[in-house]
A protein has these predicted regions:
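Hydrophobic helix-coil surface modules that form long, contiguous segments used
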Residues: 187-327
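N-terminal, polar/Ser/Thr-rich
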Residues: 2-17, 27-81, 164-167
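Short, hydrophobic/aromatic-enriched beta-strand segments in well-ordered soluble domains
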Residues: 84-86, 137-151, 194-202, 224-230
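Zinc-dependent metallopeptidase catalytic helix centered on the HExxH motif
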Residues: 313-373
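A surface-exposed beta-strand-loop module
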Residues: 101-163
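Surface-exposed beta-strand/loop patches in extracellular or lumenal glycoproteins
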Residues: 81-104, 182-186, 192-201, 445-449
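Amphipathic alpha-helical substructures
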Residues: 403-476
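Glycine/proline-rich low-complexity spacer/linker segments in large multi-domain proteins
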Residues: 135, 145-194
Length: 476
C-alpha cells in the first residue's frame, strides 16, 4: 500500500479484546454425547482469530476454499443485488460459526441446501447450520443480500470497503474493508480462490482479480466473469468498476498484463503504465517467478480515498501513480499478496519489502543507489530526536501500521541486513522467502529464522536493534 498520510487508527480496546478472547474460549468448550465418547463433539467456531490489532477479524472452525460472488450493481442507484456462495471445510464439529459481514440486508442464507438460522451482531454474521457440520466435512454457505454496500471509515478518517465514484465504485479492502460487500472469513491467514460474476449497465467496465473469463452483453447489461485461480486473502479482493480504457499486453517473458485506466487519467498515468512489463521483469530476476497468471493495474479517479492498494494481480490506484508507486504496488505481488502476514503486527514484512524493492528499482534505472536512499533525510539521515525512531518496526500498533516506520524503517532494516550478511546471502534469502511461503503466510520470527539459516550468523542483536527497539540504531 502507498499513501500520502498515515492510515488506519486503532479499532479496538481492552474491553473488545477481552470479550473476543472470552468468546473464543467459550466457543472451544464442547460436550460429547453421553455414553458415546466417539460421537461428534459439536461446538461453536471461535468468533475471532485473535489478532491483537483487529480482534474482531476472522473466525474459527472452518477453512474457506472458494468464494463465488454473483452480483449486479447500478452506479446510478448505488444498489447491489448479490449472492455469495462460500465453499469451506469444517475444522471442528460445528453447531454454529461466524462470518464477517457489514454489508446490505440479508434476504436468504443457506448451509448446503438447507435454510439456516442467522443473526447479525456488528461485524459478525452468526450462522446456525441445520444439520450440524462434522470435522472434515465440505460445505457451502449461500448468502443473498441487497442494498447499498457501506463505506467503512477508520478513526483516522481514511476510507475503504465499497467507495462510490462518479462513474462506478472503487473497492479497496485493507485491512478490514472486504466485509462491506463480501460475507467472508476476513483474515489474511484464510486464503481462498475467487470467482466474480458482475452485471452492470452496458458501457461500465468491471475489473477483478485474476483473469477475465468472459464478457457478454444483452439487453443493455454486461456481465463480466473474473476468476482468481491462486489463493488470495479477502483484503486483496477487488471488483472496481467504472469507465475505463482497457489495454492488454504481455511482458517479454509472457506474463499477460491487463490495465484499466480512467480516461481522465490516461496522460498522467502513461509513464507508470508503460513501465509495468519492465518492472515485472526486473523484480522476477531478483525475487523469483511472478506468482500469478496475470498482472496489471486499475487506475481510477477516487479523490476521497487518497492511497493505492496492492490488490492481487492488479493493484488499484485512486489517482494517477508515479513510476515509483507502481513499482511499490507491483512488488507487493510477491511480498504481501503471495507471502502474506501471519498477523497484522508483521506489516513491515509487506511494506518494508515493497519499499526496498522501489529503492532497488530506482537504482536499476539509473537513479539514487539503495545506499544513497538509505542515507537520505527521509531515512537514516533523520535526526535521532525525531519521533520517527519512537515507533517499533515489528510492532507499530494499529495506529501506525500504515505510517512511515513499517515502510521506511522496514526498508532500512533490509538494507542494513544486506550489509550485514552480504549480497549473495541477502538475495538468496529474499528469493527463498518468496518461494518457500508462496500463497501462504509468514511472521517476523519466521523471517529472522530464515535469515540466520541462510547467512549462518547469529542475528539476534541485529534484529533487536532494527525491529524490536525504539531509537535510532547507532551500530549493528
Amino acid at each position: 500500500m502507498t499513501s500520502s498520510r498515515s492510515r488506519r487508527a486503532a479499532r479496538l480496546g481492552g474491553a473488545a479484546l477481552a470479550a473476543a478472547l472470552l468468546a473464543a474460549t467459550q466457543a472451544t468448550t464442547a460436550l460429547a454425547a453421553p455414553g458415546n465418547p466417539g460421537a461428534p463433539r459439536f461446538s461453536a467456531g471461535a468468533p475471532s482469530l485473535g489478532d491483537p490489532y483487529f480482534p474482531d477479524q476472522g473466525n474459527g472452525g472452518y477453512d474457506v476454499r472458494h468464494y463465488d460472488v454473483t452480483f449486479s450493481y447500478d452506479p446510478a442507484t448505488k444498489v447491489m443485488d448479490a449472492t455469495t456462495v462460500i465453499t469451506a471445510v469444517a475444522t471442528q464439529d460445528l453447531d454454529q460459526f461466524d462470518l464477517d459481514f457489514r454489508g446490505p440486508e440479508i434476504t436468504s442464507l443457506k448451509v448446503g441446501k438447507h435454510p439456516a438460522d442467522f443473526r447479525r451482531d456488528g461485524q459478525e454474521l452468526v450462522v446456525t447450520p441445520r444439520p450440524k457440520l462434522k470435522t472434515g466435512e465440505t460445505f457451502t454457505v449461500t448468502v443473498t443480500y441487497a442494498g447499498t454496500p457501506p463505506v467503512i471509515t477508520d478513526p483516522d478518517e481514511s476510507i475503504e470497503g465499497w467507495v462510490p465514484t462518479d462513474d462506478g465504485a472503487f473497492v479497496p479492502g485493507e485491512p478490514q474493508g472486504a466485509p462491506a460487500w463480501l460475507p467472508s472469513n476476513d483474515s489474511p491467514t484464510d486464503k481462498a480462490t475467487f470467482t466474480f460474476r458482475a452485471t452492470v449497465p452496458e458501457g461500465v467496465t468491471v475489473v477483478g482479480n485474476g483473469r477475465l473469463v468472459s464478457k457478454t452483453t444483452a439487453k443493455g447489461r454486461t456481465t463480466f466473469v473474473w476468476d482468481s485461480a491462486e489463493p488470495m486473502a479477502t483484503y486483496l479482493a477487488t471488483v472496481t468498476l467504472g469507465n475505463f480504457t482497457v489495454n492488454e499486453t504481455t511482458t517479454p517473458s509472457g506474463i499477460p498484463v491487463y490495465t484499466a485506466v480512467d480516461p481522465r487519467l490516461e496522460a498522467q498515468s502513461a509513464a507508470a503504465v508503460a513501465r509495468i512489463p519492465d518492472i515485472l521483469e526486473f523484480f522476477s530476476s531478483i525475487f523469483g517467478p511472478y506468482p500469478y497468471n496475470q498482472a496489471g493495474a486499475i487506475i481510477d479517479r477516487a479523490p476521497d480515498v487518497g492511497y493505492a492498494l496492492e490488490s492481487q494481480t492488479k493493484p488499484i490506484f485512486s489517482s494517477a501513480p508515479s513510476v515509483g508507486t507502481m513499482a511499490h504496488e507491483l512488488a507487493h505481488q510477491w511480498y504481501g499478496d503471495s507471502v502474506s502476514v501471519a498477523k497484522w503486527s508483521d506489516i513491515w514484512l509487506n511494506e518494508g519489502f515493497a519499499t526496498y524493492a522501489t529503492w532497488l528499482w530506482t537504482e536499476h534505472t539509473g537513479g539514487a543507489t539503495a545506499q544513497q536512499t538509505f542515507d537520505s533525510s527521509s531515512n537514516y539521515g533523520r535526526a535521532a530526536t525525531s519521533s520517527f525512531w519512537q515507533v517499533v518496526t515489528a510492532d507499530p500498533g494499529p495506529e501506525d501500521m500504515f505510517g512511515n516506520v513499517p515502510y521506511n524503517r522496514g526498508a532500512m532494516t533490509l538494507h542494513a541486513l544486506r550489509g550485514k550478511i552480504g549480497d549473495t546471502a541477502f538475495f538468496t534469502l529474499i528469493k527463498d522467502w518468496a518461494a518457500q511461503h508462496r500463497y501462504g503466510n509468514a511472521s517476523t520470527a519466521d523471517f529472522i529464522q530464515a535469515a540466520e539459516k541462510v547467512s549462518g550468523k547469529d542475528l539476534k542483536a541485529f534484529f533487536d536493534v532494527w525491529l524490536f527497539q525504539k531509537g535510532k540504531p547507532a551500530s549493528w
